[in-house]
Amino acid sequence: MRRALLLLISALVVVAGCSTNGPSSATGTPTKTADIKRSTLDIAYSAFVDQDVHHITSKKALEAALDAARVEAKAQGGKAEVQTPAFQDSDETQLNDFKAFADAVNQLALGVQAAGGQYSAERFADAIVGGMIKASPDCHTQYISASGRVLNSSSATVTGANAMVPAEGTSLGGPDEAGLTGKVLPGGIAYITWHDFTFGGTYKIDAALRAILAKALAQGAKAWLIDLRGDLGGSAIDMTSMFLNGEPTLTVIGKTGNAGTQTANKDLRLPAEFQLPMAVILNGKSASASEVFALGLKENKRATIVGQKSLGCLGSESPNPLPGGASIHVTVQEFVGAVTGAKYNNAGIPPDVVADDATAVAKAIEILKQKI
């Protein structure tokens, strides 16, 4: 941000110095410039390189940004003919790198205008920032344009079915506003599912889950089958603690290294009658909060993970506002296994027992019956 302001002040000084009524200076005509939304690009570049937990370098970020600028220049009627400067292979912002990059982008923009193309500075900037973040793909890193268009850095796609409530069994009620519903299946397997970790207003998913578990116990439940397919987010704060006893759940990694380990809150552990055998179903449509919930259980061998690998969205982001209403969100932390040290962000949580969507519930029931 400070560099962007300094650049803006410098630009104003240049304009003031050239605004005279007399003849041109003997030094020649000032370099022609186009509107490339330079402040937007500067702030976005600085935020991305300074904050990215994956240590994106100035070189990789600006090369990706310049490649995107070339593509957009051609799309707007210009040419992609500009040399790539020698950027620094450093994970810190480089003033000279950005100056060289901005000069190259200016050449492309002027080329569009000279060719009579339909030049749009906004589209140019959107394409550049959107291309830049692809150099460090992560589900939390994204660019949101002033018009509200979301450009993701990661090409990972959400795949798989949503949770499928079995036809048989005794209903436990629902679904409620978080999609929480369940059944006690033959043999005492309590099937529970919800599609969002909701904490809003008077509704708390942890309290609602405890209530439905208590209802299942009253109906003779002997094991928990938690189906988190299609659960893409929310806040899983402390919910894993309900089934653990103070064990470490995940380790937070920042750009500068280990940022601490989270442990289950013993005060939130459910009473002994709730501590039944447990299986959790995941697939490529399980992400973020559902992964955090499953992570601590898997790391501590409290539950058997059944199904397919989860999406792999385990981290946190920092939102950075940009001029004009746009913003760039950068991944600043990722979560790894507190016990094993395994990295799950951008990789997904692998199942202990593989099963496709059609057979996952049956496979989980089979496993739980062996543990009752």
Model-derived segments and their meaning:
Residues 285-287, 300-314:
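Short, well-structured beta-strand/strand-turn elements
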Residues 4, 10, 17-251, 319, ...:
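Flexible, low-complexity junctional segments that flank or bridge functional domains
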Residues 228, 282, 307:
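Short beta-strand/turn micro-motifs composed of small residues
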Residues 232-285, 314-327, 332-339, 343-344, ...:
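Gly/Ser/Thr-rich loop/hinge elements
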Residues 114-115, 220-225, 273-279, 300-301:
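Short, surface-exposed connector motifs at secondary-structure boundaries
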Residues 352-372:
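Low-complexity, Gly/Ser/Thr/Pro-rich intrinsically disordered linker/tail segments
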